A protein has these predicted regions:
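Catalytic or ion-coupling anion/metal-binding cores of large enzyme and transporter domains
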Residues: 1-48, 53-74, 79-80, 85-90, ...
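Conserved phosphate-coordination/catalytic loops
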Residues: 91-95
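Well-ordered alpha-helical segments embedded in enzymatic catalytic cores
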Residues: 96-103, 125, 256
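Short, glycine/acidic-rich beta->alpha junctions
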Residues: 96-97, 118-122, 252
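A short, small-residue-rich loop immediately preceding and capping a beta-strand
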Residues: 104-126, 137-142
Length: 410
């Protein structure tokens, strides 16, 4: 075991004395040591429940014969960081998370890892670390927030931004805005639409690095605690079978993730993070891959902000696996890719069922025949730009020439 480098032999007696200081028993020092990367904090709504997820993972690891050891990862709430200088500090945390997790894992010689992320830069940062370290690794996220309800309709954080705009336009009162403010984010979890956090958690599942439901089971459901226990058990099974992160994160699985991205209508930020993850395995992947895949991948979901459905609806409709089954049935996925279950994507999704064709459109009745993202190039963006095509209303999909309004700050 890798951990023997830090625990075994006379030379490591000083290290064992420090393990004794931590309360480790002699029996525990003979077992695989599993690092659990906890992104728990009390400033990000998507991370408020991570401590409970981590405790469940620990139980699963111990049940399967490993020794769970928790260490932290930082996480920023982009929603709270937005609108001031704090937003300049968000993206850099992705690489800080990757680098610091690498440092902790190698310094302490862990045999395997369970990553417990949830929000925007936290998920890709830990995926980058997983690919870099190439240990047996399973992801289990904190899960999505439930949608809020305002005046009888489901709402999410994007509704809050729209409410502020309506107030500025004089079409909504201050009391109306306050009602939105108090109701659109009713629980812990990553914001309830298909924004960056939920996009990346769903793509983690599509990559094969998370168990079924990783991207969609709501944060407050007991089912997520069970998922976390199973993640702890799964990483021990991977350890015994010597299935490592780079057996799962491959060129083919990244292309699968991009295909699922197009079908789900994920965040444009996925085109910032997938290339960074690909870089860790030596795959030269950039935004030029997007349009060819988009052209052949139907957009099957219109989750908020593109439409009136939310992550809880996607979960009830069959989740990411149901979307993948639709895509696999028309030959758009590499179904032989390995996953954290020890089975292939094809085996995992074989029995997946689309339980709500209004939430997950069948491939023969998509929202559009092309994917949710598109890359545009021109004089405004000579190196390319990404647009969430699935969230653009039809009347805006026209050829128009006009004067650009360029500003130093908005």
């Amino acid at each position: 075991m890798i951990s023997d480098n830090a625990r075994s032999g006379m030379q490591q007696a000083p290290a064992r004395s420090l393990f004794n200081a931590l309360g480790f028993t002699a029996e525990e020092l003979k077992k695989p040591m599993v690092g659990i990367v906890s992104s728990y904090n009390e400033i990000v709504p998507g991370h408020m429940n991570i401590d409970k997820i981590v405790n469940a993972v620990k139980l699963g690891v111990a049940e399967a014969g490993g020794v769970p050891v928790v260490f932290p990862a930082i996480a920023v709430c982009d929603g709270i960081a937005m609108g001031h200088v704090g937003m300049k500090y968000s993206l850099v945390t992705r690489d800080l998370i990757a680098d610091s997790t690498e440092c902790m894992a190698i310094a302490h010689q862990f045999d395997a890892l369970v990553m417990v992320p949830n929000c925007d830069k936290n998920v890709p940062g830990l995926l980058m670390a997983a690919a870099r370290l190439n240990l047996p690794t399973v992801f289990v996220s904190g899960g999505p927030m439930l949608a809020g309800h305002v005046q009888g309709k489901k709402r999410s954080l994007s509704s809050m931004f729209e409410a502020v705009g309506s107030y500025a336009a004089g079409t909504m009162t201050e009391d109306d805005v306050l009602e939105y403010e108090n109701k659109v984010c009713p629980t812990c979890g990553s914001c309830s639409g298909m924004y960056t956090a939920n996009s990346m958690n769903c793509l983690t599942e599509a990559l094969g690095m998370g168990l079924r439901g990783n991207g969609t089971i709501p944060a407050v459901y007991s089912e997520r605690i069970k998922l976390a226990k199973h993640a702890g058990m799964a990483v021990m099974d991977m350890f015994r079978k010597n299935i490592c992160a780079r057996d799962i994160i491959t060129k083919e699985s990244i292309l699968n993730a991009l295909t699922v991205d197009m079908a789900l209508g994920c965040s444009t930020n996925s085109m910032l993070h997938l290339p960074a993850i690909a870089h860790e395995i030596g795959f030269d992947f950039d935004i030029s891959f997007a349009n060819p895949i988009s052209e052949k991948t139907p957009n099957l979901c219109h989750l908020a902000p593109a439409g009136p459905t939310y992550m809880e609806d996607l979960n009830e409709a069959g989740g990411v696996y149901a979307v993948m089954k639709e895509l696999a049935d028309i030959g758009l996925l590499h179904t032989d890719c390995m996953t954290v279950t020890g089975k292939t994507i094809g085996e995992n999704i074989a029995n997946a069922v689309n339980r709500n064709p209004e939430v997950i459109r069948p491939v023969d009745h998509p929202y559009s025949k092309t994917g949710g993202l598109a890359v545009l190039k021109g004089n405004l963006a000579p190196d390319g730009s990404v647009v969430k095509r699935s969230a653009v209303v039809d009347e805006m999909m026209v050829h128009e020439i006009g004067r650009a309004s360029c500003r130093e700050r908005v």
